[in-house]
Amino acid sequence: DDVYYNIGKLMYAYQLSKPEKTYKDWTYDTALKNVRQAIAIDPLPIYTQMEGDILFAQQDYAGALAAYEKVNTSNIASPATFFSAAKTKELLKGDPKEVVALMDSCIARCPQPITADFAPYLLERAQMNMNADQARNAMLDYDAYHTAVKGEVNDVFYYYREQAALKARQFQRALDDIAKAIEMNPTDLTYQAEHAVVNLRVGRYEEAIQILNNILKTDPKYGEAYRLLGLCQIQLKKTDEACGNFKKAKELGDPNADELITKYCK
């Protein structure tokens, strides 16, 4: 069984390296056949895990998930095997809450408190929590990640955590995080537009307008800024100006402008 497993493993590694021309019959199919022969002789969990990895590489996600689920009930279940199952279920468009549950099992098996080595799992679960509409839990995962890596994070981290905070209606936290992202990367207009969005959500329309005007000074073709400007003006009962900006946003290809024109502009 060991020989079959090792041949299968070699072929899998070879195919993963994306060879120009396949050597003899070193394909995923042959790798799978070898690993399944090993399983027939002795169904060791490590063989089943290899079977899952090959099926995953072949994009047979249902088969891969079945293999990973077997491994997860065995004595070699680990953070990595539960992570594989969670990612596979996500690719199968499974229930987002079930994906999070698999990620919970992954993280529960990590050394506690979580160290920097295992911290990427927290980022993955944060994203999965967002997909499952559990923004507060996502925010807590980002907090735990920040602790695990001792605050060694970049602007993208603050942008993602801000989005979780905003969705969780933690507006002050959202404002603080987006300000931090901008401080670390002042030229990224996405962050500035997001800063305007948070201000708009908390009713600070004048602040939002000022931010948006600054964006348009830098890039007069930034369609989203015109749409957001229009939304601020609607709140300030300046419908004509707002409609002009929605129209401008539409001309610049903003996909959300049409709906606003229908709603507010005769």
What residues fall within each predicted segment?
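Canonical tetratricopeptide repeat
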Residues: 6, 50, 84, 124, ...
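Canonical positions in the second alpha-helix
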Residues: 37-38, 70-71, 105-106, 144-145, ...
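Register position in tetratricopeptide repeats
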Residues: 13-15, 57, 91-92, 131, ...
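Structural marker of alpha-solenoid helical repeat scaffolds
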Residues: 40-41, 73-74, 109-113, 148-150, ...
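TPR alpha-solenoid repeat register
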Residues: 3-5, 47-48, 81, 116, ...
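Terminal, low-structured helical/coil segments at or just beyond the last alpha-helical repeat
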Residues: 231, 235-266
